[in-house]
Every structure is written in structure tokens, then in C-alpha cells.
Amino acid sequence: MADIKKSSLELIGGTPLLEAARYSKKAGVEKATILAKLEYLNPAGSVKDRIALAMIEDAEKSGKLKQGATIIEPTSGNTGIGLAAVATAKGYKAILTLPDTMSVERRNLLKAYGAELVLTEGAKGMKGAIAKAEELNQEIEGSVILGQFTNPANPAIHKATTGPEIWKQTDGKVDIFVAGVGTGGTITGVGEYLKEQNPNVKVVAVEPAGSPVLSKGTPGAHKIQGIGAGFVPDVLNTKVYDEIITIENEDAFAEGRAFATSEGILVGISSGAALKAATILANRPENEGKVIVALLPDSGDRYLSTALFNTQN
């Protein structure tokens, strides 16, 4: 009876690392090891639970967020779900602005946690959602924008939790870390921590081929929800990664499906992108015998209406 959690917030973090042997075999990987960090096992279903709790608690400690206040956040989905869940658990109201291109499942999840949604024009991307959030912040007294793209608590929580978890789980035997870049918090925090432990760890950023902002400075439309915000976020440490791999929409979809049908685990579109990058790295001759950790941000059940799984339409 001693190991009983008192709050859903205590369940955030500590996600498992899976050796994706069946997926690797299906992907033709023979000479490197791919490990998948399964972030969908956080209580609200994604890696963003970590930053939702961290940003809210940071705002509470600084006095910026007071009891009964409204939390406003521009989000492409998962941060909003995490914030809606944490806000509910802590007694805050949440208003979330997001592009109308986000999946129906994500919108319904946000509503299910009690959040109010304000949809913005999809073509304007996250910039449109950010502008709307700032407008609402001016209108609603006592409201707070936590600002995942600019908030130092975002990368800090990954440096404090996700990075150390990976290091401990691999017993320090991680050679390459692969992560998609949305806000840049995950790759910044984890990358900095791993490189502090071992400067030889290679950190690889993944971005959509349709919006290669980091590699070519060119924003554009793409279908890999959760990464490729269309600009370089303030919290992203652009010196932490050693390489950028761009992934096509269809490759992200294909690898997400391949993981589901090999490992029996549904993962999201950005997870498919990270897996594709991991297989590219694993099949390079110079990476023979190396351990590659790919961070898989969320579950595929958030994308059943998208081209990831809805292949009949």
C-alpha cells in the first residue's frame, strides 16, 4: 500500500525505453540498435505533459499564476492537452488557441479535459494561434500565457527529467539521440544533458521536408503535426544538434504504421518521422553497433482520422 500516488501529476515522467527489435527488422535495420522512448505513457498521453506541469509550477512559484486565474496558450495540440489536464488537476481554467488544421481527435480531447478552444486560420500556422492568444490575454483580466516557445521551463524540465531518464535507462550507453523539433524544448534539454554526460553523443534534429526552417530557412505547409512550427523557437538551442534530417509526410505516415504493425504500439505522426530518421541513421555504415534513442512524443489514437491510419480516404 506504500506506493500509491496522490495525484495524476505524480504520474508524469518516468516513461519506458523499448528496444524496437521487431520494427527494426521490418525496417531492414541489422547493425544498430533503435530504442524508443515511449512518451505516450504520460497520463495525458504525450511528452508535453512534462512541460505543462513544469510551466504551470514555474508560474506559480514566480507569482505570475494566481489561484482562479485563466491559462491561455497557443498550441498545436499536445501541449494544450497536457495543459488542460494539469490545469484541471490544479483548478485553473484553460483557453487554447490552435490552427484549424489540427485533427478532430485532438480538439475533442482538449474539450474532454474541460478546455475552451479558439480555432485560428490553418494557413497562418502557429503564428496565427500565437497572435490570437496574445489578443485574448489583453482582453481577459488576470490571464497568463505560459509561452511554450519562449519559456525556459520547457527545456529545463527535459534537462532535469527526460535526459537523465534516458542516460540511466541505457546505463550511459547512448550514442545518438533523435527528436523532432516543435518548440525545441525536448531536443534542447535532453541534448544538453546527454552532451554534458558524454560530449561524443550525437544529437539529431528532425523536421518536415515541407517546412525545412532549421536546415534551409524555408517555412511551408506539411502534415507532420507537432513539429515544424514554421519559425525558429526562442527556447531551441541551435548549437545542441549535430545534424538535421528532413522527413517527407508519407515517410512519417509509413513508419508510424510500420511501428504499429510490428511492435503493436500506435504512435503519432511525429513519432513516425523520428523513427524514419532513426532508421536512416541506423543503416549508415559508420553507425554499426551504435545505440540510437528516438523520442516518440505521442500515441497514434490522436490521428485515426488523418492519413496516418485513415488510408481509405
Q: Model-derived features: where do they sit?
A:
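PLP-dependent amino-acid enzyme catalytic core
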Residues: 1-313
